[in-house]
Amino acid sequence: VPIQKVQDDTKTLIKTIVTRISDISHTQSVSSKQKVTGLDFIPGLHPILTLSKMDQTLAVYQQILTSMPSRNMIQISNDLENLRDLLHVLAFSKSCHLPWASGLETLDSLGGVLEASGYSTEVVALSRLQGSLQDMLWQLDLSPGC
């Protein structure tokens, strides 16, 4: 498979996930920069310059989304898994050794946070994920390093 096709597929999947998030109407009601107490484990918006950092960020989001009860999260989590697979193919094409990122070491507190504020967690996570994906889309055009 030509690597340009993999890169194009990666960008298309990112756009699809961003659209899925946009289709979940309540995600528009919060700024991704908004500080929400207790949700510091959700990655914020910061430049994601390398393929390994992209994979690491997606692993954390995937871990957060799979612990949420909403049906919408299952599809987005599956999309993130596929996106991570594509990033690994891109990394391999650049002779990068990309270890499979595992997300956060401790998300034990997530259960309590979800019980207390599941809706807020979902809104903030999706909003920040959308911003991170848009950043990744931009970075892919710059041919990110390992």
Curated annotation (Swiss-Prot):
Q: Tell me the Gene Ontology biological-process terms attached to this UniProt entry.
A: activation of protein kinase C activity; bone growth; cellular response to leptin stimulus; energy reserve metabolic process; intestinal absorption; leptin-mediated signaling pathway; lipid metabolic process; negative regulation of appetite by leptin-mediated signaling pathway
| Gene Ontology CC entries for this record | extracellular space
Source organism superkingdom: Eukaryota
Q: Which UniProt keywords apply?
A: Disulfide bond, Obesity, Secreted
Keyword Disulfide bond appears in the UniProt entry: yes
- Please verify whether the record's keywords include DNA-binding: no
**Single Gene Ontology MF annotation:** hormone activity
Q: Name one Pfam family in it.
A: Leptin
Q: Any S-S bridges, and between which cysteines? A: 96-146
Q: Where in the cell is it found?
A: Secreted
**Similarity comment:** Belongs to the leptin family.
Name recorded for this polypeptide: Leptin
State the taxonomy lineage: Eukaryota, Metazoa, Chordata, Craniata, Vertebrata
